[in-house]
Design a protein with these regions (language model features):
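Intrinsically disordered, charged low-complexity linkers and terminal tails
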Residues: 551, 558-699
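Secondary-structure capping and boundary motifs in well-ordered enzyme cores
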Residues: 76-83, 176-179, 188-195, 212, ...
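Active-site-adjacent bridging/hinge elements
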Residues: 9-16, 52-71, 169-176, 190, ...
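Intrinsically disordered or highly flexible coil/loop and linker segments, enriched in small
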Residues: 47-51, 100-103, 162, 169-172, ...
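Betabetaalpha-Me/HNH-type nuclease active-site subdomain
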Residues: 44-73, 106, 393-538, 556-557, ...
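Short active-site loop/helix that positions an aromatic residue
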Residues: 84-100, 468-481, 619
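A cross-family structural signal marking well-folded subdomains
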Residues: 213-216, 221-440
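Glycine- and hydrophobic-rich flexible loops that cap the catalytic core of alpha/beta enzyme folds
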Residues: 2-274, 513, 519-533, 537-572
């Protein structure tokens, strides 16, 4: 490796050289603010005689001693392509400006010194060779500053237009002087002696510049030959990038997709900033075998095709499946993607039929929506869906998934109908995410509805409070102050008091009879004239009070049970694996343990004392600072002095700290629960009692 400080001008004026941006590099994506900052720096240094140089970072390239047929030396840029491309655009804007000023000599100098290899073949003429789409855009700009031949959007062209606008007859000489002062560190690597991948990682160790997907793409492609790079990129990675894109926002989701892929492969959920590291750990020798690499990428590409439909439901041609995918997208059930991608693959391979697939999609919604209604934490879903596919029995597909979900307990449970019925009486379903409220009402409205009513995208349909948020005085006269206050405090935003209206602004705070009977110009306005199912029961009502809200809640609850069904299956008690969440333990007698599972790691133990000591040691390793700023410290009598325990039993947590263990088994279990709750790890500890009931212990 050679590193030298070099002037940008000197670097670009090198003859018979081409700076190649390899396919594994991310696309050119400098934003307006970055371009303007660089140009401002150039103007500042160009106008100040006291500033001799301006440092712009580094450019790293691999020198393979590879030459084209025209003896053009190819330098593979592995870091610095954004700066190099942007500076090329500035020179290109300068060229077109001085050309328009009829300064032919200066225009030719800029063109032939910094932009092209004058005597090279057409394909090798540009000194900078970006990836395919940018290469075409750059060639269009070289011919025509108005880029008439380039019809689609290009960041490269947008930034050129910015420079074209800002570089003028008044400042172009200052810009030339500033460009002449630009300095960078030129780092030249020799593939036979240096490790470009390792150097690339060290240059991007902060992760600020590149996404996890960028790093993984580079990891896959960088060590391959140019021919293999092109093959793998075009046949696999480019397709993966296309599939893993949210077409509504035009946002790349490759990093998220690979995270979901690793989740289903490893049964562990990587941190968002560790996806690249975990990918490398899972696949450490990718380029040692092209066959293995292609097999892996073929699987990833196949799953990406299904991921594309989860992100963009309209890509699914079947309208019934598409509708369920739209619901899942509306609820943002992204945590289910590792599971659903595999189910989608089974559907695609005819392992399951359409009916089963739709039932699975409905089941995922039922689980998620029921849990939301009763207020269960969403973080528990991550681990549920992470391993759910492992429970699939392909001979009894739907039942096996239902069984697995119904076997969960505590915060991972599938809420039953009684829980739902109780929750809907009080649940505020108005002051939640608007899209969730609309999902709820849209599904209620359209159950077995022959004419589907699309609510979310219809600006004329709004959520209506039957008893208004700011009631007219007539309400107090009709219901009395006490009942009005009670409804407003406890029932205002419950499902029993919410409906849909195409005229919410007009219904407003009027009395119930006025809301029901409103009919101006014969148009649909009041409840009596509404076509919505949600308003059907309101047509015959003569009053609206607490009793009516409760009755309507019962009616909607019955409909809820039909839409978000609780699986109607029988599960034998022996179907479970015997693992019990620590918070489900009621009987704290001295039964012998077999093992516990904490954070997906199984550990053999026999006694509650062993469990107590092990768990607190693991918790202390995970979050030591939390032991000192929460009640945990006092609950286990944490200290760095042994003498404080006198004749009491104690355990060493680490090299410095100790804790008291002089508690009954019930007290030990209680302290474990308290610590898990404080640290928000309620779903992480499961225990398994020994099956031989004769085995008991004292401590």
């Amino acid at each position: 490796m050679n590193a030298n400080e070099t002037k940008v001008e000197r670097f670009l004026e090198t003859t018979k050289v081409q700076f190649v941006i390899p396919v594994y590099q991310r696309n050119y994506d400098w934003k307006k603010i970055q371009c303007e900052r660089l140009l401002d720096d150039i103007l500042e240094v160009g106008s100040n005689d006291n500033l001799k140089v301006h440092f712009i970072g580094s450019i790293v390239y691999v020198h393979d001693d590879a030459y084209t047929t025209a003896k053009i030396n190819e330098l593979i840029i592995i870091d610095g392509q954004q700066r190099l491309t942007t500076i090329t655009l500035i020179y290109l804007a300068l060229y077109h400006l001085v050309k328009s000023m009829e300064e032919k000599s200066l225009a030719d100098e800029i063109m032939e010194t910094y932009l092209i290899n004058k005597f090279a073949e057409e394909s090798e003429k540009l000194k900078l060779r970006p990836t395919d789409n940018n290469d075409y855009a750059l060639k269009c700009l070289l011919k025509d500053s108005n880029h008439a031949d380039f019809e689609s959007y290009s960041t490269l062209i947008a930034n050129f237009d910015l420079f074209k606008k800002r570089i003028t007859k008044e400042n172009y000489q200052t810009i030339r002087q500033g460009l002449a002062k630009l300095m960078f560190v030129e780092i030249s690597l020799d593939r036979s002696n240096d490790d470009p991948q390792r150097i690339f990682e060290s240059l991007n160790s902060t992760g600020l510049d590149l996404s996890q997907a960028d790093l993984i793409r580079n990891y896959i492609l960088m060590g391959l030959s140019r021919i293999d790079q092109s093959k793998i990129y075009q046949n696999y990675w480019e397709v993966i990038e296309k599939f893993a894109k949210d077409e509504t926002t035009n946002e790349s989701k490759v990093s998220e997709f690979i995270r979901d892929f690793l989740t289903l492969e490893t049964k562990n959920i990587p941190n968002k900033g560790s996806v690249y590291i975990k990918f490398k750990e899972k696949y450490p020798n990718l380029i040692s075998s092209m066959d293995e690499l292609e097999r892996l990428l073929l699987r990833i590409k196949k799953l990406a095709m299904h991921y594309n439909k989860l992100l963009n439901p309209k890509k699914e041609p079947d309208k019934e499946i598409q509708k369920q995918l739209e619901y899942i997208a509306q609820l943002e059930i992204n945590v289910a993607y590792p599971f659903l991608m595999q189910v989608y693959d089974d559907f695609n391979n005819n392992v399951i039929d359409k009916s089963t697939f739709i039932s699975i999609l409905n089941l995922v919604q039922s689980l998620t929506w029921r849990r939301f209604i009763v207020g269960l934490p969403t973080n528990a879903l991550n681990k549920m869906f992470m391993s759910l596919y492992d429970k699939v029995d392909k001979n009894d597909y739907l039942f096996s998934v239902q069984k697995s979900l119904l076997q969960r307990s505590s915060t991972q449970r599938f809420p039953n109908n009684t829980e739902i019925s109780n929750a809907l009486k009080e649940k505020d379903v108005y002051n939640i995410k608007h899209k969730n409220t609309m999902y709820f009402l849209e599904r209620l409205e359209n159950y077995q509805n022959p004419e589907y009513v699309k609510i979310e995208d219809c600006v004329n349909i709004t959520i209506e409070h039957i008893f208004p948020q700011n009631p007219d005085p007539k309400w107090r006269m009709e219901l009395g102050i006490d009942q009005c206050d009670k409804i407003k405090e406890f029932y205002l935003n419950t499902i029993g008091n919410l409906t849909l209206s195409g005229n919410n602004g007009k219904l407003g705070n009027k009395s119930f009879s006025e809301k029901r009977n409103m009919n101006v110009d014969g148009k649909e306005q009041g409840y009596s004239y509404s076509r919505f199912w949600l308003n059907k029961s309101l047509r015959e009502k003569t009053e609206w009070n607490l009793h009516e809200i409760k009755e309507r809640t019962k009616m909607i609850t019955e409909r809820f049970m039909k839409i978000w069904e609780y699986p109607d299956i029988q599960i034998k008690s022996e179907d479970g694996n015997g693992e019990v969440n620590i918070f489900e333990i009621d009987d704290q007698s001295d039964k012998q343990l077999e093992y516990y599972v904490f954070c997906d790691q199984r550990t053999e133990v026999l006694t509650t004392s062993q469990l107590f000591c092990n768990i607190f040691k693991q918790l202390f390793d995970l979050q030591p600072e939390s032991f000192f700023n929460t009640p945990i410290k006092d609950r286990i009598n944490l200290s760095n002095k042994i003498e404080v325990y006198e004749n009491k039993a104690y355990e060493q947590l680490n090299d410095t700290y100790f804790m008291c263990t002089n508690y009954t088994n019930a007290e030990k279990i209680d302290r474990i629960k308290e610590a898990l709750s404080i640290l928000k790890l309620e779903d992480e500890l499961f225990i398994k009692y020994a099956e031989n009931e004769s085995n008991v212990y004292v401590v």
